UniProtKB/Swiss-Prot annotation:
This is Voltage-dependent calcium channel unc-36. GO terms for biological process: egg-laying behavior; locomotion; nematode pharyngeal pumping; serotonin receptor signaling pathway. InterPro entries: Ca_channel_alpha-2/delta, VWA_N, VWF_A, vWFA_dom_sf. Residues 1-19 form the signal peptide. May act as an auxiliary subunit of the unc-2 voltage-gated calcium channel which appears to trigger calcium-activated signaling pathways that control the serotonin response. Inhibiting serotonin sensitivity of the vulval muscles results in egg laying defects. May act in both neurons and muscle cells to enhance motor activity as it is required for coordinated movement. Has a role in neural depolarization-induced calcium influx and pharyngeal pumping. Involved in restricting the expression of the putative olfactory receptor str-2 to only one of the two AWC neurons. The lineage of its organism: Eukaryota, Metazoa, Ecdysozoa, Nematoda, Chromadorea.
Length: 1254
């Protein structure tokens, strides 16, 4: 009972504190410190741990350069193997030829082609006759995927029976040409052999230029909308396909916004623009120009900085701006085309356009600066000699290294082909022109076709929204001819993508059995359901954040580009080749892609915690956007004589200086130059962005050969120490099963220690390692499947041996733990192992005893109605050791016991009459944790900690001068960031806290009320806390809804149009039934505002920097306060502007050895209404101690933006011999779709008009 606990606490302190003055905050804090340190010492067994480790390991100061090189070579070897597998697939495909069978759709023929459909999960199909009858034939399946959880795919259900084939929604899956190519690409034997060679080989892929994707092993398809089976994916839009299929591109999209581009035409134009943007990768650069009577470039600088890198951040930003423009006036091609060429080619010099009337009225010398004149139908173009020379020389140097220049014209027609303009700017045909004629009724084909055909391009007619996806890919096919023609130049050249979220790994929606009503017998069923769901969620966590990079090769047969063979590599696997266990606990590895964007970094937060969708800028973050400066001061050299000259000082040129220095740091890392390593004073933030820790990092970098990646290492000051085994060679024969016999240990769920067989999903990671440990003990050597991660396995075995007697040590403290309401102790190690000890407190239940089955009878059986239970701090909430929040906090505050309180776990009182520590009649208690990093001199051994019922804190504070009471004497414990760990106000409710409505606990102290606000200001002023400003460059903001609608004049008629389309749809369906069902396969999916996959999610938010002030404890600082009085002379403070009677004294003292600060706020006897907000309101916003993230409104600078060049663009295939009409076999190649081609896809267009509109 709690009464017994109170008596025990009382007895302990009577002897310890006889001379203890409870009216002195200094003495209270000192005695509390001694108690907390003693408790932690008894629970952690720190001395025993150090003695155990000293027998096995020793401290080593490592060389960061040498460790980085070792990691670099491991990663290179790992990537090389994956690259070879993709290359084997390429060679195998190129050795095959496409058969010319004509009976591929005849089930009775030997040539009938089946394939395993990713969407159906089997090889069954439905065939429609290509005639007016539309007769359909259903072909039954002969094989289906038997999907089982795969241990090597993070428990994703897969099948090795066959590869799966995905076909985009707009394509008919029984098209004969498509089927022949699907059959040609069946290289499952190669995929299977590759998979058998390497257990951790991820998905092997092939994307055909025809649109289908083959992947192995098979897995169920991830739908964009599961309920409606919405599928927006097309592998031809992926970065790995685009990179291999085309040269890198500078693209200018010209969007006709003339008065005729109204209603449906503009909607089609917008979708066409999105589809083009979808096909641009980070190796490409782009801008969008709208033109009518005026021309506008949609970037914030109106084109003055040329082209933007084709990141999702930039693409969505410009796409949003399209919605602010309206159709109006005439399309002024004579204004738009010269500007397009000028921006695209970065032309130097200047030009001017004059109407012929203006030209005739000008004096002879008015245009002396413009020596060149070109007469156009409506204008005269006058240009300077420099401008003409720039054209003749191929443009400026603003092409950012991309290989080809491309103009994409989206229009409903052009009055002229403007041959003079193209002859002037593009005489050598170096700029490709692709034209997209939009609208059902568009008839002006000739002019736009001539523009494309005369400039190495292609013209397509995009009749409606259903027409877009497939038509866009004609430009990719056109540009891929160059790759096919120059296949000998590519050799074994591989292409690597940046980071992206692989959809094949994403968790599928949970499918439950047919729902049944809850009965009195459902109790056990529901609890078992909830338990299994918890396990499923733990296993799928890694997959939900699965980001990959992909290596790809173009597949070329007879100089014809056929597609791209690829293998993707999960970044979590690459990260284990540069393992955090090999360096200091505060230091970290990071990786940059070929564009200098961050791939892996502990500060990268790619998932929006609200939407669970990846952020727009998740794969285009700059390193220095994550390495957030402490005070924007930067040191770019460790050379002492240079530092003083390089540190920026406040003044007019401060911002410019900081920018230059940060660019110097970035350049050093990109260039992998370790001759003069760089330093930055940064703030390291926790994942939830509620805490930041200052540290000084030194940066090192190594280039990853072949992949063009950069591996970096940030070593925190004083953190270049680690532990190593004393014996050079580990003796596996000394492994004892007793080390793991108690079963109370866990391994990092996302790290591989020893490889498993695909089918080993019935066992846990811990059970699997026990099997391998037994083999080690029996054979005296490491099993083959453990050799790949031998270094980590040896570290794990050392940690197991050193901590093997911890359970016995914890047993000796059973009574002490029980008396102090401690029910869990743990020790986490850098190897990813966590050893823990459970103790069940007698007065508490770990499953909600007040839950009743009868309250849920009548509902459908669901885990939502299951009995609530305790969330174990280790096994349920924190299994990732060094990657867990508490671990990262502990190692950043050396020699400090960290105290925290959790709102995601609780335990229940057994007695209904038991009161909380605050005296309230509630049936549960919160839980708190204490943890601390354990060191062997300067090297981290791990983090030790324990969990306790929060009642113990309330009872303990009552014996240290802070009993639960009213607000006359307000006593608090603040943590290292001024969050409230304890408050003695007696109306604090555990139940309210656990549902997010609590008072004081875990809240920022300075935001509680006016008294706390003033006290916080005094704490900062007296150096108890240091103020920092943190900028979150990964934040997102909600986009304001656009009130300006495009093509607004047709909006009143939208419902009429919708009625007509619904009527048309009904007639199509009726015709389908009459004709035997030929059109039945057409999708019946509701209208969706998003057109393409990338723009389907996250359209209502945009990236924006946000800033917040943080306050960090100065307990070890040079200016640590010596007085406990926050006001000189211990005078009273009157913080209320509207209440002169409020008078308080404020004191503070560090609780040494912990992260806590004790604060007392005592009201004078005559003081009144200090906490009445109507008489003592807060300063909002607070000028002295602001807190909370707010958007940073930066003025968009349009000068000297950094020109980022991709390392991937070093390879360019020449287009000089690329003729748009004649192939290498002297066949005529059209530069536009023929009318017959248009007629052949009419049924598809009709169906997909319904798909996109309703």
């Amino acid at each position: 009972m709690r009464a017994v606990h109170l008596l025990l606490v009382l007895a302990i302190y009577i002897t310890r504190t006889r001379s203890f003055n409870k009216e002195s905050i200094k003495e209270c804090a000192q005695v509390l410190s001694e108690h907390m340190k003693e408790t932690f010492s008894k629970i952690s067994h720190e001395t025993i741990l150090k003695q155990n480790y000293e027998k096995l390991v020793e401290e080593e100061q490592f060389d960061p350069r040498a460790e980085l090189k070792r990691s670099k070579h491991r990663i290179e070897d790992y990537l090389k193997v994956r690259s070879q597998f993709a290359y084997k697939a390429k060679i195998s495909l190129e050795a095959r030829s496409v058969k010319n069978d004509t009976s591929v759709n005849d089930p009775q023929s030997k040539s009938f082609i089946r394939f395993m459909s990713a969407k159906q999960g089997n090889d069954g199909t439905t065939i429609y006759e290509s005639n007016h009858l539309g007769k359909k034939l259903k072909v039954n399946e002969t094989k289906s995927f038997n999907l089982t959880q795969n241990a090597n795919f993070y428990t994703l259900p897969t099948s090795s029976v066959s590869s799966a084939v995905h076909i985009p929604t707009p394509l008919y899956d029984r098209n004969e040409e498509l089927l022949r190519k699907i059959d040609w690409s069946d290289i499952d034997a190669v995929y299977r052999t590759n998979r058998e060679e390497t257990k951790d080989l991820a998905f092997q892929l092939f994307c055909s230029e025809a649109g289908y994707m083959r992947y192995y092993p098979a897995a169920s398809w991830f739908w964009d909308n599961q309920d409606e089976h919405l599928d927006l994916f097309d592998c031809r839009n992926t970065e790995w396909y685009i990179n291999s299929a085309t040269n890198s591109k500078n693209v200018l999209i010209m969007l006709d916004m003339s008065g005729s581009m109204l209603g449906q035409r503009y909607e089609v134009a917008k979708q066409t623009t999105e589809a083009i943007l979808e096909t641009l990768s980070h190796n490409d650069y782009f801008n969008i120009m709208t033109f009518s009577k005026n021309t506008f470039l949609l970037d914030g600088c109106n084109g003055t900085n040329g082209l933007l890198q084709a990141t999702m951040r930039n693409k969505k930003a410009l796409r949003r701006k399209m919605d602010t423009y309206q159709s109006e006036g005439k399309a002024e091609y004579e204004k738009a085309l010269p500007l397009a060429f000028s921006v695209l080619l970065d032309l130097k010099g200047s030009y001017a356009l004059y109407t012929k009337e203006e030209m005739s009225m000008m004096s002879g010398n008015a245009t002396n600066d413009y020596q060149f004149h070109l007469e156009l139908p409506e204008h005269v173009l006058a240009a300077t000699r420099q401008y003409i020379d720039s054209i003749n020389n191929g443009g400026g140097d603003n092409n950012r290294g991309a290989c080809e220049n491309v103009i994409m014209l989206i229009t409903d027609g052009a009055p002229n082909a403007y041959k003079k303009i193209f002859d002037m700017y593009n005489a050598d045909k170096k700029v490709r022109v692709f034209t997209f004629l939009v609208g059902d009724e568009a008839i002006d084909f000739n002019e736009v076709r001539e523009m494309a055909c005369n400039n190495r391009g292609y013209m397509v007619h995009v009749a409606n929204m259903a027409d877009v996806d497939e038509k866009i890919h004609h430009y990719i096919r056109r540009m891929s001819r160059v790759v096919g023609r120059h296949y000998k130049e590519s050799g074994q050249l591989s292409w690597w993508t940046g980071v992206y979220r692989e959809r094949l790994y994403l968790p599928r929606p949970e499918v439950f059995a047919e729902p049944v009503p809850i009965t009195n017998q459902s109790f056990a069923v529901m609890n078992k359901m909830a338990s299994r769901r918890k396990i499923r969620l733990q296993k799928s966590e890694a997959r939900s954040r699965m980001f990959v990079t992909t290596v790809s090769y173009p597949v070329i047969v007879n100089e014809t580009f056929m597609g791209v063979a690829a293998v993707n590599i999960p970044l979590t696997e690459i990260a284990q080749k540069s393992h955090p266990a090999n360096i200091g606990a505060k230091s970290y590895f990071f990786m940059l892609d070929q564009n200098g964007f961050v791939m892996t970094h502990p500060q990268l937060r790619p998932i929006d915690p609200v939407t669970k969708y990846h952020k727009q800028n998740y794969n285009n973050m700059d390193l220095l956007e994550l390495e957030v400066g402490q005070n924007q001061n930067v040191r770019s050299s460790q050379k002492s004589q240079a530092v003083s000259d390089l540190v920026c000082e406040s003044g007019a040129n401060y911002a410019e200086c900081v920018d230059d220095l940060r660019k110097a740091v970035r350049k050093m890392i990109i260039d992998c130059d370790n001759s003069d390593v760089q330093q930055l004073d940064v703030l390291y933030a926790t994942e939830l962005l509620d805490r930041v820790y200052p540290q000084t990092n030194t940066y090192y970098a190594e280039c990853i050969n072949h992949a063009n990646f950069v591996l970096g290492l940030a070593v925190a000051k004083g953190d270049d120490y680690r532990i190593i085994k004393k014996q050079k060679k580990y003796d596996f024969g000394r492994v004892k099963m007793d080390w793991m016999g108690d079963k109370r240990w866990k391994l990092h769920p996302h790290w591989r220690y020893c490889f498993l067989n695909d089918t080993d999903t019935h066992m846990t990671k811990e059970e699997a390692f026990e099997i391998y440990a037994q083999q080690m003990s029996d054979s005296g050597k490491a099993p083959l499947l453990c050799e790949y991660r031998r270094n980590l396995v040896e570290k794990l075995l050392l940690d197991m041996e050193a901590t093997s007697n911890l359970i016995d040590s914890w047993d000796t403290q059973y009574s002490y733990m029980k008396n102090n309401l401690i029910h869990l102790a743990f020790f986490s190690t850098p190897s990813g192992m966590i050893r823990y000890y459970n103790l069940t407190l007698q007065d508490y239940d770990y499953i909600d005893p007040y839950w009743s089955i009868f309250e849920h009878i009548g509902h459908l059986l669901s885990f939502e109605h299951a009995q609530e239970s305790y969330n174990h701090f280790i096994t349920d909430l924190n299994r990732k050791s060094t990657d867990d929040r508490y671990y990262r906090r502990a190692v950043r505050m050396k020699d400090t016991i960290m105290f925290d309180v959790s709102n995601n776990s609780k335990i229940w009182y057994k007695s209904e009459t038991q009161l909380t520590g605050y005296g309230l009649n509630e049936n549960l208690t919160m839980l708190g944790q204490a943890f601390k990093a354990i060191y062997l001199d300067k090297a981290v051994l791990g983090v030790s900690g324990y969990e306790f019922a929060f009642d113990h804190v309330v009872d303990t504070m009552a014996e240290h001068g802070c009993p639960a009471s009213d607000d006359r004497k307000w006593c608090l414990l603040l943590d290292e960031h001024a969050y409230v760990f304890f408050s003695n106000q007696n109306d604090i409710s555990y139940e309210d806290y656990l549902v997010g409505k609590g008072k004081h606990i875990s809240q920022y102290f300075g935001g509680l009320n006016r008294i706390a606000q003033r006290a916080m200001a005094l704490l900062v002023e007296n150096k108890f806390y240091t103020k920092f400003t943190y900028t979150d460059n990964q934040a997102v903001c909600k986009a304001a809804k656009q009130v300006t609608l495009s093509a607004g004049r047709l909006r009143p008629f939208y419902h009429v149009f919708q009625f007509l389309m619904q009527t048309f749809n009904f007639m199509v369906r009726l015709a389908s039934q009459v004709s035997g069902g030929y059109l039945i396969w057409l999708p019946n999916i509701q209208f969706t505002e998003a057109y393409t996959a990338s723009f389907h999610e996250g359209t209502d938010v945009y990236p924006c920097p946000k800033q917040s002030s943080f306050y960090f404890s100065n307990k070890d600082g040079k200016n640590r306060p010596t007085s406990t009085h926050l006001v000189t002379g211990n005078r009273s403070e009157r913080p209320c502007k509207m209440n002169a009677k409020c008078s308080v004294k404020i004191e503070a003292a560090f609780v040494d050895g912990t992260n806590l600060v004790m604060v007392w706020i005592t009201q004078d006897k005559a003081s009144e209404n200090c906490y009445d907000e109507s008489e003592c309101s807060m300063d909002i916003p607070s000028a002295q101690v602001p807190f909370g993230f707010e958007e940073v409104k930066n003025d968009e600078s349009c000068e000297n933006l950094e020109k980022r060049k991709s390392k991937a663009n070093d390879v360019c295939y020449s287009i000089d011999d690329d003729d748009s009409e004649v192939s290498v076999t002297n066949e005529r190649r059209p530069c536009s779709l023929s009318p017959s081609s248009l007629v052949s896809i009419v049924p598809i267009l009709v169906g997909f008009l319904h798909f996109y509109m309703f």
